[in-house]
Amino acid sequence: INVIALAMPLFTMNVYDRVIPNRAIETLWVLALGVILLFAVDLMLRLLRGYFIDLASARIDMQLSAQIMDRVLGVRMEARPAAVGAFSSNLRSFEAVRDFITSASVTAFIDLPFALLFVFVIALIAWQLVIPVLLAIIAVVIYAYILQHKMQSLAETTYRAGALRNATLIESLTALETIKTQGAEGVMQSKWEKSVAFVSRVNNQMRFLSAAATNGAMEVQQLVNVVTIIAGVYLIGEGMLSMGGLIACTMLASRAVAPLGQMVGLLMQYHNAKTSLTSLDEVMKKPVERPADASFVHRPELRGDIEFGNVEFSYPGSSIPALKGLSCRIAAGERVVVIGRVGSGKTTLQKLLLGLYQPTAGAVMIDGVDVRQLDPADLRRNIGYVSQDPTLFYGTLRDNIAIGAPYADDAAIVAAAEIAGLTEFVNRHPEGFDMLIGERGDSLSGGQRQSVAIARAVLMDPPILLLDEPTSSMDYTSEQQFKQRLKTFAGHKTVIIVTHRNSLLDLATRIVVVDDGQVVANGPRDQVMQALQSGQIGRAT
């Protein structure tokens, strides 16, 4: 394409220097037809170049977005960002990289080396005219160098401010009910307006610098034309250059400086893309649960024999240990209820069993294998988990129940719903399992959300059940019915229930009391209950 760009200057030079003085009309038409043919080829090449750039961009977009999502889903919990809104802004930053790749930047990079070709052709026609072109190139490079430092600083500031603004928006949407009930609309509105105003100011500075860069490069390009013409007139007067040669050199000078002008105009996009790429690199460097070089023990089926061996653990960013040398063994098939004060470490036990976090000392064993050595997919396939605050997703009730097993058949879904106590609720709704669940399950009550979470946990009939306050939002009748169904379903499964409700204690064959990250009582239900009632917790074994 850039070689074909030489056609017009050379055509013009030959017309002025040879065709017009000699009235060579036939030569004119031959040259014109040749140039028209080259223009047709140029059009085809430009279309093909655009097509291949778009195709490459689409592939990069798909591959990069897939890798980012894979990294997000695989990130270890301790590396999970505290601010979800800011993190989502980081994830979207790949769009800036994609836009830079698909913009005129690629074309400008391709055209840049050919500036030397145009300078070389100018030198062949009149070497003296190379001097203003080289001076213009140097001037554009210095000008861009001066601007790019400030642009880099503004791009980083814009990125951070945009992430803060996005975090405010996400927090406001997800906590809208709390904001309304607490009368915090004014606080969030003020926070939003301040972040938007700051982003707007920085963006204005970025746009000003970008305009200054683009317009400055255009001025240099125009000046080089003027200087080339002035110098060319003197060369013509001395008989060192023809009129056609001057016109050709003027056209070539513009072509030589144009790619640099384009590059300067793309400085803002470049710095935005560079900042975004740095952010993406931080995301991709986060530790994941299944590193590519890791080798896990493959255990598709687990019995449910669990042991905590002198386990110590602190949550990321916390100096207070959640577990302090905790030791406990749960045999396969046992139903254990874990009780204790708020913040004593009960929920942490279940999270360590799931491999969501790793102990800082000691080991968590299942069937004699350290949880850290088990493939996370195998581990969680064998565990049904109900969290304290279950999260539902936008979609149908069927989709929410089978979110971890999308190929589960209707019979399994119906059976899971029956165990969870959802059958009556489903039968009352005209759409049944196809009823639409709002984002985060806001259209359901707390008890219904818990029932959906229970249905998820039992859907694939896992050998281990971890239930964290599974009935905290249920009424007495629903809780009693659930207890009866759970006793039937549990059978020989290993069940660990974390609760504050005494009504669930009769599900246990054994009770473990946890306090301040340590087991202070561990024994048969009746024995521990008696010790609790008499105040002799330390003697319950």
Q: Where are each of the predicted segments found?
A:
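Cytosolic ends of transmembrane helices, especially the final helix of ABC transmembrane type-1 domains
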Residues: 54, 181-184, 208, 256-285
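Transmembrane helix-loop-helix hairpins at lipid-water interfaces of multipass membrane proteins
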Residues: 1-48, 52, 124, 128, ...
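Juxtamembrane loop-to-helix connectors within ABC transporter transmembrane domains
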Residues: 71-117, 174
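Alpha-helical segments in transporter systems
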Residues: 1-10, 14, 31, 35, ...
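Transmembrane helices of ABC transporter permease
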Residues: 31-41, 107-157, 230-241, 258
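Loop segments that connect adjacent transmembrane helices in multi-pass transporters
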Residues: 66, 70-71, 75-83, 157-206, ...
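ABC-type nucleotide-binding domain
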Residues: 300-541
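Hydrophobic alpha-helical segments in the permease module
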Residues: 35-46, 137-139, 210-221, 243-265
